[in-house]
Amino acid sequence: VIAGAARTDGPCERSFTVTLPNSMISIAVARSVIRRITTFESDDAQSSFLVALTEVIGNAMDEHVRMDIAEPITLSVRCDSTDVVSVSDLGAGYDMTDESSAPDDPTHQSGRGLALARAFVPAMGVVSSDVGTTVTLPLVGLGIVR
């Protein structure tokens, strides 16, 4: 039984990284990896996390295409006292605190992915710098890495 995604057996203290090509297959690969290594609290928690992950990877791929970046996107999983999944890309990023850069029209074709991801994983973090962007998706309250 998972109680609030807290580890009862102590931290597992391991991590790994998967490089994902800028291809739609990367979304399926990432989702499969997470499903295989994570025990979710419920089917709804799994669905919510996977929707957020899909949006984050899709945004990273869009940014790489827009900026003509050939390097892969990185999916990292850290398993310690709190389990975290991270997606890193080499794009310019998006300032989640700058409301003026978000589209005003909810029917706009882009700009909603990270907001949707945050709706499903409220503790999501975004760090952008001149060398890229990393989005962290904590599993707290959703599941644990096995």
Regions found by a protein language model. Name each.
Residues 1-17, 61-146:
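Conserved beta-strand-loop-beta-strand hairpin that lines the nucleotide-binding pocket
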Residues 1-51:
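Bergerat-fold GHKL ATPase/HATPase_c domain
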Residues 44-71:
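Conserved ATP-binding N-box helix of the HATPase_c
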